[in-house]
Design a protein with these regions (language model features):
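Membrane-proximal basic amphipathic "stem/tether" segments
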Residues: 104-167
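A structural motif corresponding to the C-terminal lobe/cap of the Radical SAM core domain
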Residues: 1-127
Length: 167
């Protein structure tokens, strides 16, 4: 398959390889979503992919699926709709998927992230070492979304601690 060849070649020549998946398309089933999640974990294990992200489908204006969902009256175009397009709240559990609930999609997204990052770090323990070695450096540069989120959390803790000590 050309996709796997591209991933394999990019990783072999030293490129940073990151995969992004969208789950929960209107026609998808639970099995379809699980296939995407396990494919991401497989690529992390087999080829050394550095980052695997999962997003839940949302219908974008002008797209074929948007028009289809609008025609079927499965989405309402109002201010709230556009507000939700620009900001994704992980606690929101809405789904356009006919076969999977919003709560299940949120769980699958979390499961996908968890499985992928566990695979990314356990399959190549040097990444754990490099992360901790570089984390407290002034010029820390995260190699994936997980590291960025940990770093953001750390910075917020430091700022809150500093703010509380001033008060």
């Amino acid at each position: 398959d050309r996709l796997i060849e591209s991933i394999k070649t990019a990783a072999r020549i030293g490129h940073t390889v990151k995969l992004n998946f969208i789950i929960g398309f209107p026609h998808e089933t639970l099995i379809d979503c699980l296939k995407s999640i396990f494919f991401g974990a497989y690529c992390a294990l087999r080829f050394g992919v550095l980052d695997v992200n999962y997003a839940i489908f949302s219908a974008y204006p002008g797209s074929e699926l948007f028009e289809k969902l609008k025609k079927e009256k499965k989405l309402h175009v109002d201010d709230n709709y556009f507000k939700n397009l620009s900001y994704q709240d992980v606690t929101q559990t809405f789904s356009y998927c006919e076969h999977i609930s919003g709560k299940m999609l949120a769980f699958l997204r979390f499961f996908g992230f968890s499985l992928s990052y566990i695979t990314i770090y356990i399959s190549r323990p040097i990444r754990i070492y490099n992360f901790f070695k570089n984390f407290f450096q002034k010029n820390f540069f995260p190699s994936n979304l997980f590291e960025q989120r940990i770093y953001d959390f750390y910075v917020r803790l430091k700022l809150n601690k500093k703010k509380n000590s001033i008060s």
